[in-house]
């Protein structure tokens, strides 16, 4: 059994993206706010003594920046894992602003995170997020021999998919055991 520490990235500066009028997936280039940088540093402090042997990160700017702060405290290289990426609110990548994303989130929530029977939505079902995220974490846990834990810097929806916890604060750390993975 391997301990896995799931870290939600620090607060991102989406205002910066909005000012540039960058649509859709370009929002994933948003860096952390000053507060987000602090949250990342606090997470790094919290994880300094957990005996981590692997540090995984989603490829997005906000997670990579958070993982960088954690890396400085745990002295591990960051391993980028594509399948720890954020939930896809629109798999056509055609959304233009946060108002559209909020509407998609509301639809996701009203459907309990899964497409209604016989229907298809543009958003990624929670079961898909769970499948890809849990596979990454299981592989990482299986590669740990002789003890040690794993840190995975990711997103609220990824954490929700593997823990069932709906809300996770920016910079929050949640611990699970590899045996608890879905």
Residue ranges of model-derived segments:
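Short, well-ordered beta-to-alpha junction loops that form the rim of enzyme active sites
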Residues: 57-61, 83, 153-157
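Phosphate-handling substructures
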Residues: 26-31, 72-132
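Short, active-site-adjacent cap segments at secondary-structure transitions
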Residues: 13, 63-64, 86-88, 158-160
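Residues at the C-termini of beta-strands that transition into short coil/loop
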Residues: 8, 82-84, 177-180
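Active-site-adjacent alpha-helix immediately C-terminal to a catalytic or transition-state-stabilizing loop
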Residues: 134-182
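Active-site-proximal alpha-helix that buttresses catalytic centers in soluble enzyme cores
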Residues: 2-80
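Short aromatic-enriched loop/helix-cap "lid" or pocket-rim segments at secondary-structure transitions
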Residues: 15-20, 90-94, 165
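Generic structural signal for well-ordered alpha-helical scaffold segments
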Residues: 41-48, 130, 134-142
């Amino acid at each position: 059994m391997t301990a896995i520490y799931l870290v939600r990235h620090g607060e991102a500066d989406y205002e910066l993206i909005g000012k540039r009028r960058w649509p859709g997936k370009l929002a994933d280039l948003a860096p952390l706010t000053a507060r987000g940088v602090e949250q990342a540093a606090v997470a790094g402090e919290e994880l300094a003594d957990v005996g981590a042997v692997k540090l995984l990160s989603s490829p997005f700017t906000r997670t990579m920046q958070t993982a960088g702060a954690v890396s400085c405290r745990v002295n591990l290289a960051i391993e980028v894992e594509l399948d720890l990426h954020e939930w896809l609110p629109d798999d056509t990548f055609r959304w233009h602003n946060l108002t559209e994303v909020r509407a998609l989130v509301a639809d996701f929530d009203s459907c309990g995170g899964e497409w209604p029977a016989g229907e298809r939505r543009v958003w990624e079902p929670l079961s898909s997020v769970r499948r890809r995220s849990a596979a990454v974490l299981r592989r990482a846990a299986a590669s740990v021999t002789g003890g040690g834990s794993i840190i995975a810097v990711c997103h609220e929806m990824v954490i929700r998919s593997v823990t069932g916890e709906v809300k996770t604060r920016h910079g929050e750390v949640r611990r699970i055991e590899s045996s608890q993975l879905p």
